[in-house]
Structures are given as C-alpha cells and as structure tokens.
C-alpha cells in the first residue's frame, strides 16, 4: 500500500509540473521593456511599457504601478525630472504614460510594481530616448 501511495504522489507531482501557470515566481521573472524606445521630445510625449513574465513569454495584466519616477539618469542628469501621468491602455500587459519631456536625450522611467500573485515588490527601469 505504501508503494501505491508513493506512486500516486509521484504521478500527481508530474501532472502539476506540466501546468502552464508558474507555481513559484520571483521578482526577476518579469521584464519591463519599452514598446517604442524612441519617443518625441516635448509636452505630451507618450511612453508605453510592456511587462512580460519571462518563463512563459506572456504579458502580465493587472499590475499596480504605485511609484514612478521619470528622470534623465541615462545621461547622468538624475536631478532632471519630468512630470508624467498614467494613461489607459487596451493592450494586455502594456502600461502607458503621458510625459512632458523638457530635453532631448535619455530618460529613465523607474517603476515599483505589485504584480498579481507576487509577494515582493518588483522594481524596474525602462529607458527611452527623446528625439
């Protein structure tokens, strides 16, 4: 009987291993990437970030972005910041912002996010180039 129980437990473990949803995830299992890295310089620039779960390659929906900062740290000007505001997006896993970029060059959008099912806060920096 013990051998039967062990065999059933092993079979159940193999069945669960084949599911598409990750059983355990980590903050580094997500990638934040610019939809378009080159954006227009000036008022009303549109920035879009795609969040992807690396192991599955699928977009991540329902992310809560609770702290954002937009600065020129890629060009060694951390103190140069820009006003920005979240905008609605209809594309799964894409999070949009409207920004007032005051200078051409590299802009870093720094994000802190709560990802559904993830215990830890996920942090990322997405770089855009204003032209």
Segments (PLM) and residue ranges:
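Contiguous segments within soluble domain cores/interaction surfaces
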Residues: 24-104, 108-131
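Bacterial N-terminal signal peptides that target proteins for export
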Residues: 1-9
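N-terminal signal peptide c-region/cleavage motif recognized by signal peptidases
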Residues: 18-20
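Cleavable N-terminal signal peptides
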Residues: 11-13, 23
